[in-house]
């Protein structure tokens, strides 16, 4: 694969020893294959976003060394660019959920080698109002759990893995009414959680949605109704299988556009970041960004 000049963005909040180890694993590999590698370290929350917004035409690839939060910032900047560089994800976070969908090795050195020897594929990006996400958007239980944890728990578990851990112990959740317009068809629902997905993993757990794909131009919409959460727990622990067994408790549909309204504004979780709320309009931007993937994907 031919690359001229790349930008490598890495999370500066990972601790000095961790940063040195991570850079030591990937920089020699990238430097061997690239004419030039510019390394930028994030220090403040929005740095990754601003680094990507200011990319010039000479940069043809952006490598993101970090977790799902850093990737989320970069994708929000790159998705709005007229000329978009290719993106390579180097999994350096707690969950690294989207990298799992792409089949990227979770070992950093192996990931760098696989991407350099790999190929490009065009993936869908989802747009929510004026923001973008790669993996998922959710309201209800997932947003409430992510928003309530303290900094120590975040550091130990990561926001989304904390959700999956809490899901194993929480006995019930309050349901809420919502009105959905799915590709123009309006339905009213009562649910404990609504997930709108592009990826297939949450907190390293694969959700076995039968038709999920990151290049089909469709959202995967999961409505979770059962307040005792048994069905949701079972679904997230299944390696494979059919969602049909949860009829009545869970509903799964695909759509290119969904509008969500709730009686009162509900906080929304996008790729592990809780900073938006309902109402929301979500649509797919088909094959919007080129990503590097291993050759066998």
UniProtKB/Swiss-Prot annotation:
Gene3D superfamilies referenced in this protein's UniProt entry, alphabetically: 2.60.200.40, Probable inorganic polyphosphate/atp-NAD kinase, domain 1
Metal-binding is among the record's keywords: yes
Location of the active site: 273
Gene Ontology biological process terms in this record: phospholipid biosynthetic process
Keyword annotations: ATP-binding, Kinase, Lipid biosynthesis, Lipid metabolism, Magnesium, Metal-binding, Nucleotide-binding, Phospholipid biosynthesis, Phospholipid metabolism, Transferase
GO-annotated molecular function: ATP binding; ATP-dependent diacylglycerol kinase activity; metal ion binding
Residues in coiled coil: none
Sequence positions that bind ATP: 42, 67-73, 94
Cofactor section: Mg(2+)
EC number(s) on file: 2.7.1.-
Domain DAGKc: 1-132
Binding site for Mg(2+): 213, 216, 218
Root EC class: transferase
Cofactor binding, note field: Binds 1 Mg(2+) ion per subunit. This ion appears to have a structural role and is required for catalytic activity.
Family: Belongs to the diacylglycerol/lipid kinase family.
Biological role: May catalyze the ATP-dependent phosphorylation of lipids other than diacylglycerol (DAG). In fact, is not able to exhibit diacylglycerol kinase activity in vitro.
Listed name of the protein: Putative lipid kinase BmrU
């Amino acid at each position: 694969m031919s690359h001229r000049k790349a930008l490598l963005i890495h999370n500066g909040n990972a601790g000095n020893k961790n940063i040195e180890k991570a850079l030591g694993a990937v920089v020699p590999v990238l430097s061997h294959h690239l004419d030039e590698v510019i390394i930028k370290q994030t220090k403040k929350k929005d740095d990754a976003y601003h680094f990507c917004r200011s990319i010039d035409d000479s940069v043809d690839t952006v490598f993101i060394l970090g977790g799902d939060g850093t990737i989320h910032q970069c994708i929000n900047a790159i998705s709005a660019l007229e000329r978009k560089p290719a993106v390579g994800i180097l999994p350096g976070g707690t969950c690294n959920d989207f990298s799992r969908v792409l089949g990227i090795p979770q070992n950093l050195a192996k990931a760098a080698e696989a991407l350099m020897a790999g190929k490009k594929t065009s993936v869908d990006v989802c747009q929510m109002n004026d923001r973008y996400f790669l993996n998922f958007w959710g309201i209800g239980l997932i947003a409430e759990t992510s928003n309530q944890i303290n900094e120590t728990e975040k550091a130990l578990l990561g926001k989304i893995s904390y959700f999956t851990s809490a899901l194993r112990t929480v006995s019930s959740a309050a349901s809420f009414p919502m009105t959905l317009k799915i590709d123009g068809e309006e339905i009213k629902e009562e649910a404990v959680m609504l997930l709108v997905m592009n990826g297939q993993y949450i907190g390293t757990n694969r959700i076995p949605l039968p038709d999920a794909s990151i290049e089909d131009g469709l959202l995967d919409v999961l409505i979770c109704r059962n307040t005792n959460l048994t069905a949701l727990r079972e679904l997230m622990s299944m390696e494979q299988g059919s969602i049909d067994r949860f009829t009545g408790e869970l509903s799964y549909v695909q759509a290119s556009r969904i509008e969500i309204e709730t009686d009162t504004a509900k906080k929304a979780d996008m790729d592990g970041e809780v900073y938006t709320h309902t109402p929301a309009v979500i649509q797919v931007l088909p094959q919007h960004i080129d990503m590097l993937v291993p050759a066998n994907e």
